[in-house]
């Protein structure tokens, strides 16, 4: 579109406490969520894949560590870890459980680093916030061969 060059393509927080952007062309008035068509779609025609609201995903949250993903951490760090017998497994309590769900994508209240699709956070599945939503999806409608 004409006039879109150099403008932000997602609704996110720019700096400390700056929810709407700066004065002039970069002010998107995105104090909270914006309409779905406020920004251009991605190459697949999907809107707001980053920014506006975080999206719940189906995954149960599990933190990644070097034992799970050895190729991401090629240095063997077991010499620097506490031994397992030093932990009290009887009274172990964690925020991470089978009820912890992943959300990602960044929201209007998050900084730019959360807009990356690789960033993950978690929240109890029965919780809600003003910055988390979900995306409705369906199979393609119409007949095959009509450009869909």
Region roles according to the model:
Residues 48:
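Short, acidic, Ser/Thr-enriched surface-loop or helix-capping motifs
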